[in-house]
Amino acid sequence: MIYSEFTTEQNIVLHLLRRNLHPSKEGGLSKELCESADWNEVFLESLRQAVPIMAFDSAAEYREYISEEIFQRWLMTSGNVFQTNERVAQAQKELVAILEKEGYRYLILKGLAAASYYPRPEFRGLGDVDFLVEADKTKEVGKLLVKNGCKKWGCAHGHHIAYQRSDAHLELHFEVAGIPYGDAGERVRAFLKDMLEGGRKVALSTGDFVAPNEPYHGLVLLLHMQHHMLGEGLGLRHLCDWACFVERTANEPFWQETLLPFVKEIGLFTYAAVMTKTCALYLGTTCPDWAADADEQVCAEVLDDIFKGGNFGGKDIKRAKSAMLISERGKGGTNHSKTYNLCHGFHAYTRAKHPSCQKCFLLYPVFYMVEGFRYLGLMLAGKRHSPFAMRADADERKAVYDKLHVFEKEEKQREEK
């Protein structure tokens, strides 16, 4: 199917993904479309969206329309992603062995946990190894990582500590990403408090590990998606993660018994429904009854946002950075002003980068000035964008995100209507 609101090349990328996820359901492209397409742009778009292997696997049947140069570059890029996947998977395998040997409970988040729902798990591109441990074991596990050759990397974040190996980046989570402020955040923490008690044992060719049980995995994906969408930006890889999860589990009772009642409780139901229907419309996956009424125009706007930004906002850095005016990476929804978001985000950044502030609040003004002048210097050097220059991008993005009602209770949504 070809969608008029998207370019030929974007339509082909979507077709290639549908063909990869559901080969028996998706027909082929017409000769006219293949001949008119810019296949280099198709390749580049798949790369910007972090889905080059899936797209290349399906594109092989259209090789006669793709120049040898482009085909070989796509092949080489896919090979490089495969090599990265192997390194990351090996790093995870060694990490799991260390944790299990020492008796630490853990869960692998996203990454290979998400890939396990794909028809071909090896086609899902990997980045970091994200894993969750008990919060009070964070220091012990951190020391264990250092003992085994890892180095602490960067400053602490609100939910994880990063470590670097020679071959991979590890993120030691003491909390999952995307948990909001306020009452919704407390409800999420209460929902996830027993997350480490069980777990889903996953056996892949790259190694065995423990992942979250399905209701937890679903919530982790939703929190992660909105965290990045309202942050630097979401890519098609994230959308494929959700599509594959829904496709594999749509008929499981946990949706009606556990997950959907909870996302309604915290104000994520509209978001979940829109993302699910977006997957159904454009990636060909199942659309459960609970998502059938999601606004198709909003779904189209969400996909347009994904195409404009690319994976982690890599297609347009200014647009990605405009997130500082929209929301603090989704933690407070989208109901605050640009000034509030800018100031609140700046405070959170300073607090994370300079932990000494938490011990002596009098240091805050000092580090506010340090970070403020640092940003000003980078801005004058042309290495950062002025918040004023990002207002138009922020307004355009926020107009879409407001329709998703992230962390808004249904009563409030009805009042707004």
Language-model region placement:
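Conserved NTP-donor binding/palm subdomain of two-metal-ion nucleotidyltransferases/polymerases, i.e.
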Residues: 1-127, 133-417
